[in-house]
Amino acid sequence: MVNIFDYLKDVAHDSFYDLPLNELDILTLTETTYLSFDNLVSTVPQRLLDLAPQVPREPNMLTSKNRLQILDELAQHKRFKNCKLSHFINDIDPELQKQFAAMTYRLTLDTYLIVFRGTDDSIIGWKEDFHLTYMKEIPAQKHALRYLKNFFAHHPKQKVILAGHSKGGNLAIYAASQIEQSL
């Protein structure tokens, strides 16, 4: 059976100029965003190649063997190793009952990918998931919109793709639907 690791081997020598960004690329970066980039990725863009060895390797619910393997492969492949990562945030606020995490990837000179993380392993994260069923707007959605507005404040008129897994997908859709059309 073909899997994401087979895909990564197939495109290892293709740049994003050779083969445009596609859903499988986004899937790999969405999975990577679940890893702990706390205190590693700031507002200063850094290459994935340089960051990969610094990511904590202690296994837990979010830091799985497969996610670490994806990260290690991305760091070796022409397609991903020079991607610049920035603006990682992991904000868990018990008072607001908010669990929010996101990161920006610069894939080419004019293409950015913002990935919103889905639910993590915190009680707050799961509680916020349940709030999605009956609240008009949850705190993480507000934060996702702020994150996107901040991106455009620093990168006006840039091409950006929004993505996320599970709740992260909801955050991407929410931010895209609420942002001013002029941006």
Provide a role label for each language-model segment:
Residues 1-163, 170, 174-183:
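Non-catalytic, mobile gating and regulatory segments of ester bond hydrolases
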